[in-house]
């Protein structure tokens, strides 16, 4: 136990938290959800157990998602959640506290970044460093970002979409959007409610997105059955929904992400544009798993787009790889506040 390296790379996401432990790889992946007692604020459950309570809790229990659009919405609950996950990975020792590299969206303000660092320190870190998500995602996707060549990353998470061109270890141009996978779910809920007068929950919307969601119209449409509450009768009801309906539902959110990608591409310096055209766009993040999202990007931009090998884990893996080369702090790859 004394010889264990407690260095951690943390992807503190809106939807889930992933933790990389040096020498072990990804050791934790759990939802960013905390259940508390309304009156006392006592934490009842964290992660998967708390997520299972979403929408099902009695009046005295609240299930909270403390991260919104990639930033801390509830500082105290975020700190408790981080503390729980760090203890789960490293144990309760107050002597051997971990060194942590934690990821933040590229568009975060200094106040938002400071909040993440302070929450990480309060949660039990010995030292805390920041790395911007596109850089972590690029490293985690296996790109060599230290070379004088352009690499383009589109990281579509749960709460934010980060689009960036990276060269010589830093971000040359970027755009951070607070539109991502969660917005797809919200779009689907709204669409089903308006078209079918049926109320469905977040889990049901996510299931539809995963099973039949698509970024481009399919030649052979997919269908899925979904259950919800009929807003007219108040009774449970089941309907069949098609993939092209899901595309219609999420089209505005998709358009926002595509516009963000276009903005970045218009700002790419000419000397790096040829690199992007040659190597293509790398897609990371859970939102990038949307069916045909890579094909849509290729069609719109005229540049090949590829889904990373482990899109959901890329950010945490990148933070972990930085742990193995922590000396890169000196080159400014990571902002160190504490």
Where are these regions (language model features)?
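Nucleotide/phosphate-binding catalytic cleft detector across ATP-hydrolyzing
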Residues: 1-156, 164-282, 288-338
């Amino acid at each position: 136990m004394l010889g264990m390296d407690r260095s951690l790379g943390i992807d503190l996401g809106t939807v889930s938290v992933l933790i990389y432990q040096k020498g072990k790889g990804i050791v934790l992946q759990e939802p960013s959800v905390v259940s508390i007692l309304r009156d006392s604020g006592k934490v009842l459950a964290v992660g998967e157990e708390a997520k299972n309570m979403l929408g099902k809790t009695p009046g005295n229990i609240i299930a909270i998602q403390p991260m919104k659009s990639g930033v801390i919405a509830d500082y105290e609950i975020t700190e408790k959640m981080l503390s729980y996950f760090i203890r789960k990975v490293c144990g309760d020792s107050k002597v051997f506290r971990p060194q942590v590299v934690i990821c933040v969206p590229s568009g975060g303000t200094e106040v938002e970044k400071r909040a993440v660092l302070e929450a990480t320190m309060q949660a039990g870190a010995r030292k805390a460093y920041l790395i911007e998500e596109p850089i972590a995602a690029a490293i985690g996707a296996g790109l060599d970002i230290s070379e004088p060549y352009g690499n383009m990353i589109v990281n579509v998470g749960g709460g934010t979409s980060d689009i960036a061109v990276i060269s010589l270890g830093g971000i040359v141009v970027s755009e951070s959007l607070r539109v991502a996978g969660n917005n797809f779910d919200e779009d689907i809920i709204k669409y089903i409610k308006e078209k079918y007068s049926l109320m469905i929950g977040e889990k049901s919307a996510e299931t539809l997105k995963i099973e039949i969601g698509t970024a481009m119209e399919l030649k052979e449409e997919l269908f899925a059955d979904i259950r919800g509450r009929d807003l007219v009768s108040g009774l449970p009801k089941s309907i069949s929904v098609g993939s092209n309906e899901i595309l219609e539902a999420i089209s505005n959110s998709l358009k926002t992400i595509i516009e963000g990608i276009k903005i970045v591409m218009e700002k790419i310096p000419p000397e790096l544009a040829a690199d992007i055209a040659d190597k293509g766009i790398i897609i990371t993040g859970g939102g990038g798993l949307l069916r045909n999202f890579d094909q849509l990007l290729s069609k719109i931009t005229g540049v090949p787009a590829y889904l990373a090998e482990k899109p959901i884990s890329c950010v945490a893996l990148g933070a972990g790889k930085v742990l193995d080369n922590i000396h890169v702090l000196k080159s400014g790859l990571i902002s160190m506040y504490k």
